[in-house]
Amino acid sequence: MRKLFFCGVLALAVAFALPVVAAPKAPADGLKMEATKQPVVFNHSTHKSVKCGDCHHPVNGKEDYRKCGTAGCHDSMDKKDKSAKGYYHVMHDKNTKFKSCVGCHVEVAGADAAKKKDLTGCKKSKCHE
């Protein structure tokens, strides 16, 4: 009976630990995105409460996380490009299938004016330098 109990506890421990071990390692902080007029320094550690899939989307049905501006993804740097290829659009549009940076920040800031300025402002915000 003890062996069976021990095996059950061990199986549960492995089952709960597996997703943590299998999760992709986030890139180092200080990722500088310079495709916009005002560069953004992105820190994954600041966003650790957000699931990878909340920002990154599957590529060919796989969770193949890549940089947003990777060739074939959001590689159109034309600010007026409102398609899914438009880099500016996917970062700033509040109504995309996957949450944009600004869309998520608006939600997080809520009605707090100071947070709104910090998280959604173009100049002197916590995003743009």
From Swiss-Prot:
It holds the Pfam family Cytochrom_CIII. InterPro entries: Cyt_c_III, Cyt_c_III_dom, Multihaem_cyt_sf. Keywords: Electron transport, Heme, Iron, Metal-binding, Periplasm, Signal, Sulfate respiration, Transport. Heme c 3 binds at H47, C101, C104, H105. Heme c 2 binds at H57, C68, C73, H74. Residues 1-22 form the signal peptide. One of its GO terms (biological process) is anaerobic respiration. Binds 4 heme c groups per subunit. The keyword Metal-binding applies. The keyword Metal-binding applies. It is found in: Periplasm. Heme c 4 binds at H92, C122, C127, H128. Gene3D superfamilies: Cytochrome C3. GO terms for cellular component: periplasmic space. Heme c 1 binds at H44, C52, C55, H56. GO terms for molecular function: electron transfer activity; heme binding; metal ion binding. The second and fourth heme binding sites have unusual CXXXXCH motifs. Participates in sulfate respiration coupled with phosphorylation by transferring electrons from the enzyme dehydrogenase to ferredoxin. This is Cytochrome c3. It comes from Nitratidesulfovibrio vulgaris (strain ATCC 29579 / DSM 644 / CCUG 34227 / NCIMB 8303 / VKM B-1760 / Hildenborough) (Desulfovibrio vulgaris).
